[in-house]
Amino acid sequence: AKAILLPVSAPSHSPLMDPAGERLSKELEKIGIMDIKYPVISNADADFYPSKDKVSSLLVKQLSMPVRWEESVTKALSSGTEAFIEIGPGKVLCGLLKRINREIKSFNIEDVDSLKTVQNAFKA
């Protein structure tokens, strides 16, 4: 395994987030989790959310557990994923994808222009 230092402003994905996890758990109890319509991979266990009943506990776990990024990407690829879209400023995740496999198609959406670029790429 290899660790990469990322510039972040919070101790995400570490035990220092346990108090936030407790608060998140209480908030998630107040809302209803809907049935899963689309496959989503949890970075807590690098597997698809099995049911709506497990969503809350996995969301809480991912706050304080290391991200299983490479395993999650591998799972997505083995399940037929052909492209990844990173939404938000920067291209950190697209860069990390290329470290796993330079052939992976990845796109970044951070503004209207990049959204149009991605839309055009998927029209073909």
Task: List each language-model region with its residue ranges.
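Acyl-group transfer acyltransferase/transacylase scaffold of fatty acid/polyketide systems
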Residues: 1-124
